[in-house]
Amino acid sequence: MPASMESPGAALEVLDKRIVPIVEAVARAARDAGSPAVRLERALEVLFGAYGGSDPGLSALLLEGWVRAQRDKQYRLRLAWQREQLRLLLQDILAEGAVRGLFRSGLDAGAVAAAIVSAAEGCLLQAAMQGGAVSPAELSRALVALTLRGA
Protein backbone atom coordinates (compact mmCIF):
# COMPACT_ATOMS: atom_id res chain seq x y z
CA MET A 1 0.00 0.00 0.00
CA PRO A 2 1.47 3.44 -0.86
CA ALA A 3 2.46 5.54 2.16
CA SER A 4 -0.20 8.11 1.22
CA MET A 5 -2.91 5.45 1.68
CA GLU A 6 -1.77 4.30 5.14
CA SER A 7 -2.88 5.72 8.45
CA PRO A 8 -0.51 8.43 9.71
CA GLY A 9 0.72 6.22 12.56
CA ALA A 10 1.41 3.25 10.28
CA ALA A 11 3.15 5.47 7.73
CA LEU A 12 5.42 6.89 10.44
CA GLU A 13 6.28 3.35 11.55
CA VAL A 14 7.29 2.48 7.99
CA LEU A 15 9.38 5.65 7.83
CA ASP A 16 11.09 4.81 11.13
CA LYS A 17 11.86 1.25 10.03
CA ARG A 18 13.76 2.63 7.04
CA ILE A 19 15.33 5.78 8.50
CA VAL A 20 16.37 4.84 12.03
CA PRO A 21 18.74 2.07 10.84
CA ILE A 22 20.46 4.58 8.54
CA VAL A 23 20.95 7.04 11.40
CA GLU A 24 22.23 4.22 13.63
CA ALA A 25 24.66 3.03 10.94
CA VAL A 26 26.01 6.56 10.45
CA ALA A 27 26.36 6.87 14.24
CA ARG A 28 28.37 3.62 14.38
CA ALA A 29 30.64 4.82 11.58
CA ALA A 30 31.07 8.18 13.29
CA ARG A 31 32.07 6.55 16.59
CA ASP A 32 34.33 3.84 15.15
CA ALA A 33 38.05 3.83 15.74
CA GLY A 34 40.17 5.72 13.27
CA SER A 35 41.01 9.24 12.32
CA PRO A 36 38.24 11.77 11.72
CA ALA A 37 38.97 11.61 7.98
CA VAL A 38 38.46 7.83 7.94
CA ARG A 39 35.32 8.08 10.08
CA LEU A 40 33.92 10.83 7.84
CA GLU A 41 34.56 8.69 4.78
CA ARG A 42 32.81 5.69 6.39
CA ALA A 43 29.86 7.78 7.56
CA LEU A 44 29.40 9.26 4.10
CA GLU A 45 29.66 5.82 2.48
CA VAL A 46 26.76 4.73 4.68
CA LEU A 47 24.70 7.88 4.13
CA PHE A 48 25.27 8.25 0.40
CA GLY A 49 24.97 4.50 -0.09
CA ALA A 50 21.55 4.53 1.57
CA TYR A 51 20.26 7.74 -0.02
CA GLY A 52 21.77 7.24 -3.46
CA GLY A 53 21.66 3.48 -3.62
CA SER A 54 18.96 3.30 -6.29
CA ASP A 55 16.31 2.22 -3.79
CA PRO A 56 13.18 3.76 -5.25
CA GLY A 57 11.20 2.66 -2.18
CA LEU A 58 13.34 4.70 0.22
CA SER A 59 13.43 7.62 -2.16
CA ALA A 60 9.65 7.61 -2.55
CA LEU A 61 9.15 7.22 1.20
CA LEU A 62 11.28 10.24 2.04
CA LEU A 63 9.99 12.40 -0.80
CA GLU A 64 6.43 11.60 0.30
CA GLY A 65 7.46 12.32 3.89
CA TRP A 66 8.75 15.76 2.97
CA VAL A 67 5.45 16.57 1.26
CA ARG A 68 3.49 15.30 4.27
CA ALA A 69 5.72 17.28 6.63
CA GLN A 70 4.32 20.52 5.21
CA ARG A 71 0.94 19.72 6.75
CA ASP A 72 1.65 17.04 9.36
CA LYS A 73 3.52 18.02 12.51
CA GLN A 74 4.50 14.43 13.35
CA TYR A 75 6.19 13.99 9.98
CA ARG A 76 7.86 17.38 10.33
CA LEU A 77 9.23 16.45 13.77
CA ARG A 78 10.32 12.96 12.72
CA LEU A 79 12.14 14.13 9.61
CA ALA A 80 13.69 17.09 11.45
CA TRP A 81 14.96 14.69 14.14
CA GLN A 82 16.48 12.38 11.52
CA ARG A 83 18.13 15.22 9.62
CA GLU A 84 19.48 16.83 12.79
CA GLN A 85 20.92 13.54 14.06
CA LEU A 86 22.80 13.06 10.80
CA ARG A 87 23.99 16.67 10.79
CA LEU A 88 25.22 16.50 14.39
CA LEU A 89 27.07 13.21 13.85
CA LEU A 90 28.88 14.67 10.84
CA GLN A 91 29.49 17.97 12.62
CA ASP A 92 31.21 16.16 15.50
CA ILE A 93 33.57 14.36 13.12
CA LEU A 94 34.31 17.56 11.22
CA ALA A 95 34.91 19.58 14.39
CA GLU A 96 37.29 16.95 15.76
CA GLY A 97 39.17 16.79 12.47
CA ALA A 98 39.49 20.58 12.35
CA VAL A 99 40.83 20.73 15.92
CA ARG A 100 43.35 17.99 15.12
CA GLY A 101 44.49 19.84 11.99
CA LEU A 102 43.27 17.17 9.58
CA PHE A 103 40.60 19.32 7.99
CA ARG A 104 40.73 22.82 6.57
CA SER A 105 41.58 25.63 8.93
CA GLY A 106 38.52 27.67 9.85
CA LEU A 107 36.15 24.93 8.68
CA ASP A 108 32.58 25.71 9.78
CA ALA A 109 31.72 22.17 10.89
CA GLY A 110 27.99 22.88 11.28
CA ALA A 111 27.59 24.48 7.87
CA VAL A 112 29.66 21.80 6.12
CA ALA A 113 27.69 19.03 7.87
CA ALA A 114 24.42 20.64 6.75
CA ALA A 115 25.73 20.88 3.18
CA ILE A 116 26.72 17.21 3.24
CA VAL A 117 23.26 16.15 4.46
CA SER A 118 21.70 18.33 1.74
CA ALA A 119 23.89 16.70 -0.91
CA ALA A 120 22.85 13.26 0.34
CA GLU A 121 19.20 14.31 0.17
CA GLY A 122 19.83 15.40 -3.42
CA CYS A 123 20.80 11.79 -4.13
CA LEU A 124 17.25 10.80 -3.18
CA LEU A 125 15.99 12.91 -6.05
CA GLN A 126 18.53 11.31 -8.39
CA ALA A 127 17.46 7.85 -7.20
CA ALA A 128 13.83 8.72 -7.91
CA MET A 129 14.82 9.74 -11.45
CA GLN A 130 17.04 6.68 -12.03
CA GLY A 131 20.41 8.33 -11.47
CA GLY A 132 22.33 11.47 -12.16
CA ALA A 133 25.51 12.77 -13.76
CA VAL A 134 27.62 12.17 -10.65
CA SER A 135 27.32 8.94 -8.67
CA PRO A 136 26.70 9.07 -4.91
CA ALA A 137 30.12 7.47 -4.32
CA GLU A 138 31.88 10.14 -6.41
CA LEU A 139 29.96 12.88 -4.63
CA SER A 140 30.87 11.43 -1.24
CA ARG A 141 34.58 11.23 -2.14
CA ALA A 142 34.54 14.80 -3.45
CA LEU A 143 32.96 16.11 -0.24
CA VAL A 144 35.56 14.35 1.91
CA ALA A 145 38.34 15.75 -0.28
CA LEU A 146 36.97 19.28 0.08
CA THR A 147 37.19 19.10 3.87
CA LEU A 148 40.82 17.97 4.00
CA ARG A 149 43.57 20.39 4.86
CA GLY A 150 45.48 21.43 1.76
CA ALA A 151 42.62 20.55 -0.59
Map each language-model feature to its residues.
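Hydrophobic alpha-helical connector segments
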Residues: E24-S59, A109-I116, A137
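Hydrophobic/aromatic-rich alpha-helical bundle segments in the mid-to-C-terminal region
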Residues: R76-A80, E84, A98-A145
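Helix-loop "lid/cap" segments that line or gate small-molecule binding pockets
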Residues: A29-A30, E45-G53, A60-R71, A142-G150
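Amphipathic alpha-helical packing segments from all-alpha helical-bundle domains
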Residues: V20, P56-L61, K73-R100, A111
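An amphipathic alpha-helix adjacent to DNA-recognition modules
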Residues: P2-A27, E41, R87
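Residues in soluble alpha-helical coiled-coils and helical-bundle/repeat scaffolds
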Residues: M5-G9, R31-S35, G52-G53, Q70, ...
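Hydrophobic recognition helices of helix-based DNA-binding modules
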Residues: V14, R18, I22, V26, ...
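C-terminal peripheral helix-coil segments that are non-catalytic and often amphipathic
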Residues: V38, R42-A50, R87-L88, D92-E96, ...
